[in-house]
Regions:
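Conserved ATP-binding N-box helix of the HATPase_c
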Residues: 1-20, 24, 71-78, 155
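Short beta-strand-loop-beta element adjacent to the nucleotide/active-site pocket used for signaling
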Residues: 23-32
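GHKL-type ATPase core
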Residues: 31, 45, 56-197, 204, ...
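Acidic ATP/Mg2+-coordinating residue in the GHKL
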Residues: 36
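A short glycine-centered beta->alpha linker in the GHKL/HATPase_c
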Residues: 40-42
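GHKL/Bergerat-fold ATPase module
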Residues: 174-200, 229-232, 241, 327-421
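Charge-rich (often acidic), low-complexity intrinsically disordered regions concentrated
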Residues: 206-207, 221-225, 252-256, 262, ...
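Helix-hairpin-helix
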Residues: 210, 214-237
Length: 457
């Protein structure tokens, strides 16, 4: 729901502001209230947003926070399955010159994949935004890495332009202040690259295109695809490119994709990728971690798998509140992100973890990495993040991705090494000065004796 609120606000040019309240009403029974300052949802679309699973378009090849097509509807379903209670939504939105407000209570019809309205009420709205209230059972609140608090904390580092106020079940109120006042540039939709599509993708294009021939369907649906390249595919596969797309078979789609693998294409355009930016990452890390040292960078766009563009962003923070506290001791912390969204599960199998663990940290002045007050930040930006599983919480260890993460992090590690060396040198200098200060009275006294003069005051 946080990512949905961010996306809606940014599309409207609004700096996101979210209020979250998690109230415990019994053991493993909670009420969640989530409200934002976005543009609101028109009444006709409220139940579509909250009650339709996989409502997004399969072929929007655009960098997005959303991962699974579940989002808010998944939350509504879980609430309904564990408590039987309906969702309650208040939406305030602009319709022409009028500011409208509607209160709705509804449930999800799972079989029909749509909402069932139970109650609705108009009311005078004062501002735009959405508030949703859900109940959950058989869940627990935790301060662990996979818990709500940690998710919000990490979200703020990847989204420093937002403000989130969170009241936890104990009544404690956390205010995560905005560290940047710039609404991010919206990413542009780009055509898929031939090296990044599957046979299923090609078949989907064929069944949903308005083009009349394979040739025009391929040139209009894929980047870096010209009539000349289509003619090459026709020669290599023997498939008639003047056939109707709706008649395409799985075997033909598979043959076309296998042909793509043998061909060379220009790298895809990278103007559809919008990174957070090193300056914004630094602001976010400083706001949350308050470190003694910080360094960030954004790498140039490159490709993996022969044709999928991606950008790696990295940050390293040392000292202050960096790292995580375990048994009252600060240990190292790895923060993994994909398109600004924290990945809090399946850390061990992730390419980001693999890349960071493969670095020899002793070379950079960190003798015991696991027990050092350091936080590592890595964000992968792509229209097609290569997740390892359907859970979409860990990134596949593609060689190009692992290489980029290592290069980015080692560049920052060298800067940290300089800081640690300077810190060590300053400490040694201070120790030498202290030794001199301790012996100074003795030296003065002995010098006075040699000069047969009185000891100066």
């Amino acid at each position: 729901m946080i990512t949905n609120s961010f996306d809606a606000a940014e599309e409207a040019g609004i700096l996101p502001e979210i209020n979250i309240e998690l109230k415990r009403i019994d053991k493993e029974h909670y009420i969640l209230r989530h409200s934002d300052n976005g543009p609101g949802i028109p009444e006709d679309f409220v139940m579509q947003v909250y009650c339709s699973m996989f409502a997004g378009s399969k072929f929007r090849n655009i960098q997005s926070r959303g991962q699974q097509g579940l989002g808010c509807s998944g939350c509504v379903l879980l609430s309904q399955m564990t408590t039987g209670e309906p969702a309650r939504v208040i939406s305030c939105y602009q319709e022409g010159d009028d500011l409208k407000g509607v209160k709705m209570k509804f449930k999800m019809d799972v079989k029909k994949n749509k909402g069932m309205l139970m109650e609705r009420e108009d009311f005078p709205a004062e501002h735009t935004g959405v508030c949703i209230e859900l109940q959950f059972k058989d869940v627990s609140y935790s301060m662990a890495e996979q818990g709500a608090f940690e998710y919000i904390r990490r979200t703020m580092i990847g989204n420093p332009h937002a403000k989130i106020t969170f009241r936890d079940p104990t009544g404690h109120k956390y205010i995560f202040k905005r560290a940047a006042n710039i609404v991010p540039i919206l990413p542009k939709e780009v055509l898929p690259h031939p090296k990044g599509v599957s046979a299923d993708d090609i078949l989907f294009m064929a069944k949903h295109t308005d083009k009349r021939r394979y040739k025009s369907m391929l040139t209009s649906s894929l980047s870096r695809m010209s009539n000349k390249r289509v003619n090459e595919i026709e020669e290599l596969t023997g498939i008639d490119m003047n056939k109707r797309p709706k008649d395409m078979t799985w075997a033909e789609a598979e043959a076309i994709v296998n042909c793509f693998k043998k061909m060379k294409f220009m790298a895809p355009p990278s103007n559809g990728l919008i990174p957070i930016g090193s300056e914004q990452i630094e602001k976010g890390m400083k706001q949350i971690l308050k470190p003694e040292f910080i360094a960030t960078l954004t790498r140039k766009p490159v490709t993996y798998g022969g044709g999928v563009s991606f950008i790696i962003e990295a940050g390293i923070a040392y000292g202050g509140d960096s790292g995580r506290v375990v048994n009252e001791q600060r240990k190292s912390e790895i923060m993994r992100f994909a398109n600004r969204v924290p990945l809090t599960f399946d850390q061990g199998s992730c390419a980001i973890t693999e890349a960071l663990k493969s670095i020899d940290w002793k070379r950079y002045g960190i003798k015991d990495f696991d027990n050092s007050p350091v936080t590592l930040f890595v964000n992968i930006i792509s229209t097609q993040v290569p997740y390892l599983s359907t859970g979409k919480q860990s990134v596949s260890p593609e060689p190009e991705i692992v290489h980029e993460i290592r290069q980015a992090t080692m560049t920052l590690a060298r800067k940290l090494q300089k800081h640690l060396r300077a810190k060590k040198a300053a400490k040694e200098k201070a120790m030498r000065s202290k030794v001199f200060e301790d012996y100074l009275p003795v030296i003065i006294e002995e010098a006075a004796k040699l000069g047969e003069t009185a000891v100066p005051e």
